């Protein structure tokens, strides 16, 4: 029975899905599995949160010249990871996200960073660091998450190609030539997760800003129910459409992050 044109194209497309960044291949790579796998490795003393956080930051910095996925790197991530290791030694982990490397999109307020919205002009106009975290970032930290930094997006999260005037064009990890879009606007989070730099990260979604880059980069992107996740401390795009949620490589990991950030807005 002859196959349809759509089936033929689907088969051929797999031949070109070759990432230009080498994926983690060893089963012992702590960043290659799920969050549950990672925490099980910590419990076996295969690795520490500090070791894995250093590896995540090293990968991100080594690849960022090509990927343009990260706007700003945290200078407190290693301290957060070491604090998690201390809690682990005393059997006082806060939950499944404790010690887990995570990112947040550039439109989120993050203590100690300017909120640039991935815009070069906005970064010039408002260069000062903000004094507090957005509610979602604060909840990630309260859960013990290690925040690696802020990921690039389309300027002000208004487009769908991952084009930032601050960091440049975010690159799709499956495209050697730089022709295929990573999608947007939560492009940097999707790419960082896809490449095994972080387990999950925060994004926003009005008309597909999480779901589109998730599809293009082969990860999970969620648009939660409107109002499920608080929006305080995040640059708004469309007040009656804005939803915030996770991107991750695995559905279970996205669910863990959503569980940590969901709840009433205290503002």
Residue ranges with predicted function:
Residues 37-44, 124-128, 242-249:
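Short, well-ordered beta-strand elements within core beta-sheets of diverse protein domains
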Residues 1-80:
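An N-terminal boundary/leader segment
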Residues 33, 47-51, 76, 131, ...:
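Conserved active-site and cofactor/substrate-binding residues in soluble primary-metabolism enzymes
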Residues 98-244:
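Short glycine/serine-rich loop/turn segments
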Residues 43, 57-65, 82, 86-89, ...:
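Sec-exported extracytoplasmic/periplasmic mature domains
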Residues 65-124:
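N-terminal, positively charged, Ser/Thr/Ala/Gly-biased leader segments
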Residues 36-39, 54-57, 78, 82, ...:
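Predominant activation on well-ordered alpha-helical scaffold segments within soluble catalytic domains
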Residues 26-28, 223-267:
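A short helix-breaking turn/cap at a secondary-structure junction
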């Amino acid at each position: 029975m002859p196959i349809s044109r759509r089936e033929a194209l689907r088969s051929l497309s797999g031949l070109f899905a070759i990432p230009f960044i080498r994926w983690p291949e060893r089963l012992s790579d702590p960043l290659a599995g799920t969050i549950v796998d990672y925490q099980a490795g910590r419990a076996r003393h295969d690795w520490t949160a500090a070791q894995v956080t250093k590896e995540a930051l090293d990968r991100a910095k080594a690849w960022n010249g090509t990927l343009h996925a990260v706007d700003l790197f945290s200078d407190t991530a290693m301290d957060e990871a070491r604090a998690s290791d201390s809690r682990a030694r005393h059997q006082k982990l806060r939950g499944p996200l404790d010690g887990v490397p995570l990112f947040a999109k550039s439109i989120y307020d993050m203590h100690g960073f300017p909120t640039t919205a991935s815009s070069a002009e906005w970064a010039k106009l408002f260069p000062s660091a903000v004094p507090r975290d957005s509610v979602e970032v604060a909840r990630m930290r309260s859960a013990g998450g290690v925040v690696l930094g802020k990921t690039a997006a389309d300027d002000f999260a208004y487009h769908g190609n991952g084009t930032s005037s601050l960091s440049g064009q975010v690159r799709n990890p499956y495209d050697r030539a730089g022709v295929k879009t990573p999608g947007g606007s939560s492009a940097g989070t999707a790419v960082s997760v896809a490449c095994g730099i972080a387990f999950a990260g925060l994004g926003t979604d009005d008309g597909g800003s999480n779901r589109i880059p998730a599809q293009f980069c082969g990860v999970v992107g969620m648009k939660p129910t409107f109002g499920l996740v608080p929006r305080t401390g995040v640059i708004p795009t469309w007040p009656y459409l804005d939803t915030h949620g996770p991107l991750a490589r695995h559905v279970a990991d996205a669910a863990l992050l959503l569980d940590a950030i969901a709840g009433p807005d205290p503002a």
